[in-house]
């Protein structure tokens, strides 16, 4: 399966999640989203005592352009986004650039982008009940309100979802999103 993977603020194209996907046999396109401006913006907002953040588009224009360029790769079967990358994937959907299967891992779409719903063919969300970065309630509402066939998997994990990824839950959800072709 050909996947576009969009990493989080602390992630990278060579991080645990895209590496696991590659090791599982997927063709993974994982661009470096260059999140420096986003992190700087968030540090400024949090230092000013603003816990709820919806970032202005200028703060994420570079990662968005990078994601758009990667999305133009022919044959992408699904988009996978983790935290900030999940919010960025939701922005691609909001802009009408992607309508296919979408796997979101603790997505920061509402928290950082102000996006509360998506219109895609299929949606799967993996979120840890012990996440102290992105509210679990955001994913519950997204799954409930999505204009898509949605699956929400709440797991006994934290924001990084390390145990869940190691247990193969990303792969299980991808199989739900894009069922294997029958011979």
Locate each region found by the language model.
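Serine-hydrolase catalytic machinery in alpha/beta-hydrolase-like enzymes
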Residues: 1-78, 87-91
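Acidic catalytic loop of the alpha/beta-hydrolase fold
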Residues: 11-12, 129-134, 159-160
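Short alpha-helix in the alpha/beta-hydrolase fold that links the catalytic acid
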Residues: 17-18, 135-144, 166-167
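Catalytic histidine neighborhood in serine/cysteine hydrolases
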Residues: 29, 144-161
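Conserved alpha/beta-hydrolase fold motif
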Residues: 78-80, 102
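A conserved short beta-strand
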Residues: 98-110
């Amino acid at each position: 399966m050909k996947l576009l993977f969009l990493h989080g603020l602390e992630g990278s194209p060579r991080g645990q999640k895209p590496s696991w996907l590659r090791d599982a046999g997927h063709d993974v396109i994982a661009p470096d989203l260059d999140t420096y401006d986003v992190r700087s913006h968030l540090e400024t907002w949090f230092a000013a005592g603003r816990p709820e953040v919806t970032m202005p588009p200028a703060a994420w224009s570079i990662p968005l352009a990078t994601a758009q360029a990667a999305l133009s790769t022919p044959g992408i079967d699904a988009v996978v986004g983790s935290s900030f990358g999940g919010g960025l994937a939701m922005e691609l959907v909001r802009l009408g650039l992607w309508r296919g299967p979408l796997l979101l891992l603790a997505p920061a779409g509402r928290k950082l982008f102000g996006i509360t719903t998506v219109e895609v063919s299929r949606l799967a969300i993996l979120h840890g009940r012990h996440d102290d970065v992105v509210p679990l309630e955001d994913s519950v509402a997204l799954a409930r309100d999505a204009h898509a066939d949605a699956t929400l998997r709440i797991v006994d994990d934290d924001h990084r979802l390390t145990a869940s990824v190691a247990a193969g839950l990303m792969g299980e959800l991808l199989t739900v999103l894009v069922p294997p072709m029958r011979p």
